[in-house]
Amino acid sequence: YATPVMAADARALMDHLGIARADVMGYSMGARITAFLALNDPARVRSAILGGLGHHLVEGVGLPLGIADAMEAASLDHLQDRQQKMFRAFADANKADRAALAACIRGSRQTLSEAQVGAIRCPVLVAIGTKDDVAGDAHRLAAMFPAARALDIPNRDHNLAVGDKVYKQGVLEFLEQRP
């Protein structure tokens, strides 16, 4: 289930709902999907908000495969790696379908080239927690877009940034200011 397929699914959902154009927001894997949607269907994306994904969109392949392994582990007690434990605990707390998450992590490892990122013309917000050791650098990715800005979410890691007030306020301000 590769990222371009997930982006096509998002477009199909927009079609089904009768949404011709939208501000599209995604976090982590959702941000990767948002970027692919903005590249492949630019007329559909008014603006893009990429949370929890920085320059690893270009220079990385997504979440480490060990996180997929952690989703399939018998229990949290079987894990030693801090990052694997963090993601597994988050999935368990949210009663996520861990097998589906593992499959998505393994399947959504596609990157964009710097030229492809530069071809995304809509306004873009790249927002990452300052303690996020998964996403890559927000400022490096924002500099690759023609019209983007970076938002640092202070003292938040990959899992805590998504619900942070600074993130929410930054998104609202971005949407109010975009053309």
Model region roles, listed by residue range:
Residues 22, 26-27, 31:
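Conserved alpha/beta-hydrolase "nucleophile elbow" surrounding the catalytic nucleophile
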Residues 1-23:
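Active-site loop/oxyanion-hole signature of alpha/beta-hydrolase fold enzymes
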Residues 32-40, 44-75:
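Flexible "cap/lid" loop of the alpha/beta hydrolase fold
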Residues 89-113:
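Hydrophobic, aromatic-rich cap/lid helix
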Residues 120, 126-128:
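Short beta-strand/loop motif that positions the catalytic acidic residue
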Residues 148, 153-179:
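Catalytic active-site module of serine/aspartate enzymes centered on a nucleophile-bearing elbow/loop
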Residues 129-132, 155-157:
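Acidic beta-to-alpha connecting loop that harbors the catalytic carboxylate
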Residues 133-138:
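Conserved alpha/beta-hydrolase "acid-adjacent" motif
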